[in-house]
Amino acid sequence: MIRDERVAAILAAGGSGVRAGLRKQWLELGGESVLRRAARALVACDAVDELVVVVPSGEEGRGLAEVEGLGRPARAIAGGAARADSVRNGARAAEGCGIVLVHDAARPFATPGLAARVAEAAARDGAALAALPVTDTVKRAAPRDGAPIVEATLDRRALWLAQTPQGFRRALLLEAFEAAGDRAAEATDECALVEALGAPVTLVPGEPGNFKITGPDDVARARSILEAPVAMGVGYDTHRFAEGRRLVLGGVEFEGDGLLGHSDADVCAHAIGDAILGGAGLGDLGRHFPDTDPRWKGVSSLALLREIAAKVAAAGFRVGNCDVTLAARRPKIAPRAEEMRARLAEALGVTPGQVNVKATTGEGMGFVGRGEGIAAHAVALLVRVR
């Protein structure tokens, strides 16, 4: 990169989002707005010295707030009636910069490396854009009553799909806007204006993941990238033995003294419940079923699991599977493990094949080995459904 010229990144976020039916620049993806994600990639590029965010008139304050703290000087200015007006305003505002990068705020997945390559090509050649070679066969259509017909098959070897960022010497871009006049609004990108001057534009290999959010399907695609389709939680619980209480594990009653607790003290169900709540980011068992609440005194822990399954469903998850290990000298778990699996699965609304129960004796070590109580370790896998 030629470092004797400053580089400004212009983030075009002045659109109304009419095609998508939403204001794309403010849409939240994975905890951040689309605009901030797009800005983050630009300012992470070492070549970029400053950021100019172009937003709808009256929303400059919001636009600036979205890009604060990203490590580059930034300002927000008002856009115009058309994209060309907004980018022209941004280029004019980038005084003192020899190179400008223009990037769609609706492309939140561009990488800093791509921005650097486009900036370098623009500094060297005057104008450049990120683009992908066409891989599908392309047909040119002709109108016909009822449905269009194929007029010709184009040679895809000469066809590229334009992306952003697009980079320019600032003076060249402003000259292109001046020459186009009112016709600038008809151009679908800035490179078309430079091409109209007869100036060469260099193609820089783009990135397949650098797609533009234009409609609901694109929003769903972006969310599928940023929001993990599965989540995992870990649960752990212990209870000491207490005389005169029922011993319930996995919803199944065993012979012998039970465990001390506010509910039925089913340590197996409690560990599973904690794992499921943790995977959904919903805290722990004590938060939802505190031992200070008389509603849960003596209640079956299977009822708690039903409540937990409903809570995680409301949070957009379903239980994929869970695996629990009991550490206990007594009782013998293996003979009744299948019964426990069935009870737990019914409470969670899953099949027994999605629940696994196993046990260890602790080899005589610790409080488990001394026969003072039972411990349970559980892991749960949750599947995001929305």
UniProtKB/Swiss-Prot annotation:
One of its GO terms (molecular function) is metal ion binding. Keywords: Isoprene biosynthesis, Lyase, Metal-binding, Multifunctional enzyme, Nucleotidyltransferase, Transferase. The record marks 156, 212 as: Positions MEP for the nucleophilic attack. 4-CDP-2-C-methyl-D-erythritol 2-phosphate binds at residues 237-239, 262-263, 284-286, 289-293, 360-363, 367, 370. Transmembrane segments: none annotated. Residues 231-386 are annotated as: 2-C-methyl-D-erythritol 2,4-cyclodiphosphate synthase. InterPro entries: IspD, IspD/F, IspD/TarI, ISPD_synthase_CS, MECDP_synthase, MECDP_synthase_sf, Nucleotide-diphossugar_trans. This is Bifunctional enzyme IspD/IspF. It comes from Anaeromyxobacter sp. (strain Fw109-5). The lineage of its organism: Bacteria, Pseudomonadati, Myxococcota, Myxococcia, Myxococcales.
